[in-house]
């Protein structure tokens, strides 16, 4: 038995029915069967009162545990008033609770409970917006009723979301179950959305009632009478147990289509149920079109399982080679992935993530994979999508609801196993409408997506047969749980030679066809094409190159149509300034000569690799280090490490750093720069400054340094070496741990560069300044140093 004297989680249950009680509300309860003693005990602060909803109104019958719902609210009594039939009490709702056990006695019901407070998943701003929206809809409803001004004054005075919902629920025609559903919903956001849904249904219902009443008063509306008669006929048939009449020709057509769709049994059952609803509706009713559209979606979706077809790897390789020049490592990865699918005889879809700069062929690779697999190809552009409903669809209760884009794409493909490209997945955005990236977790999880449930479809759909290919420019903005579900394939920027072959063998012919030209009318010479690539584009891919070729094609088209040129119209290198204007490329070039303190570093940007000049100079001052060029925190720390390492390792006692300022600048000051890979370049620039030894202007370097003088590996080596080769660099220092990454670098680039691996700053200074550092044990013994001199590097 429960001891009511135990004040921990024990309370007295007051049964209530057909009302909504939410925390923070004030309400009046009637107690027609309570004795005076029982009424007085309601105000006892030592007893917890719990208002607990009944599942239905049981009248005089004795209540049992199963008659109650499990979620209720505690309340305090503010005032009690005697009435003709009993008592009424003004109460304030305190907390939401969940009942664990009951103890039902002759004159009281007690229960053990635990608190289940609301989940506040709305910001104050969102709550205020939801309150204002509810008031707005209520105003629109009240305009149809005379004398509603007093009611609206009470509504406008409500500021709390729970209080407003509880107050309005007394005037709404919603079922007891729907009222209890509001209380049972713990999320404040979900409760508000459900209430708005009920309110909008109420609005539409009242609107229809007023319209029908008006039409019926003016004239016995045929459609209205038909609706009433249909409902009456349906009720009579159910009462007489006659069932439905024989199906019409239209219904037989739907039955045949449902059979032909080869749905799973549970889906077929849903479709037949919807068909039954459709038969009972008037074609002119709003519900008729909602049911019809849903039924059409069920029928048109592909349900039939596809047999796994053998993959012709040679044909797949041929298609990839034919449609994409270069990218050998990427194509190898794709072919290997297809080979694994073939060996496993795996019908389940795969999930690849192609990551790389814009214009390198990520989306078109997905199309080629679809062709290689002989599957349908569909593409979803997800850039800027911020509504979860775009992925999961809208619930059918909303006006204008539709399925999510995943289900729409499957319907468009007409097959259950298409290749689906999710483009720009890194540009999904979260908002108050939900997080689309989180919605994609179910779509891209092989353990879950065989029962993916779209909100509109509302039945499980098997996505496990779909071959998903996502594309992104960067991994940084992709949530980690989503990234874990995909196999990442990096696509690097193209080399100059690759761009030339792509332009010559693919882009020129494609652009000519788009502009109605052929190779007998327009010819772009090789030298001109090379110059377009080097001076009129600044990109990792070839999208800008295609635009420049298209510009030339448009100019040529105008000249050819006007008979202003002889055919073929040849574009030479010297013609480019007249056709394309001033060159737009701003790639830095290696300098012819350097001064002490200037070093060439290497950077990796979204459009490929670049060289980066680092300049250092000294002056009289107070020992400060000045850093300019819009450097990030990591790069500033690299400069501090370089200076500390310089002071500790070089024999420079002749320089008093307390009386000298050092200024380090990285040109292109409007461009933000960050990262640790400029460490050895910063160190070398400072060493060059204090020793007065120049660094070869054709030498560039990249690598992170530590206070121990170690050179650590960096990222983006391929792009950096491509940028060095393009800028005219002939010698590059890289970290020793990055030597393995040279396998990713095209052979043509490696042949034009002398690449030297370095492991410590001693190696760096030996290659750049031709000096060696003293042994590390001499660092704190300046007497061992020869002031102002350096030991030449050993051969």
Swiss-Prot record:
One of its GO terms (molecular function) is serine-type endopeptidase activity. ATP binds at residues 356-363. The keyword Chaperone does not apply. CDD domains: RecA-like_Lon. Signal peptide: none annotated. One of its GO terms (cellular component) is cytoplasm. SMART domains: AAA, LON. InterPro entries: AAA+_ATPase, ATPase_AAA_core, Lon_bac, Lon_bac/euk-typ, Lon_lid, Lon_proteolytic, Lon_Prtase, Lon_prtase_N. Keywords: ATP-binding, Cytoplasm, Hydrolase, Nucleotide-binding, Protease, Serine protease, Stress response. ATP-dependent serine protease that mediates the selective degradation of mutant and abnormal proteins as well as certain short-lived regulatory proteins. Required for cellular homeostasis and for survival from DNA damage and developmental changes induced by stress. Degrades polypeptides processively to yield small peptide fragments that are 5 to 10 amino acids long. Binds to DNA in a double-stranded, site-specific manner. This is Lon protease. It comes from Clostridium beijerinckii (strain ATCC 51743 / NCIMB 8052).
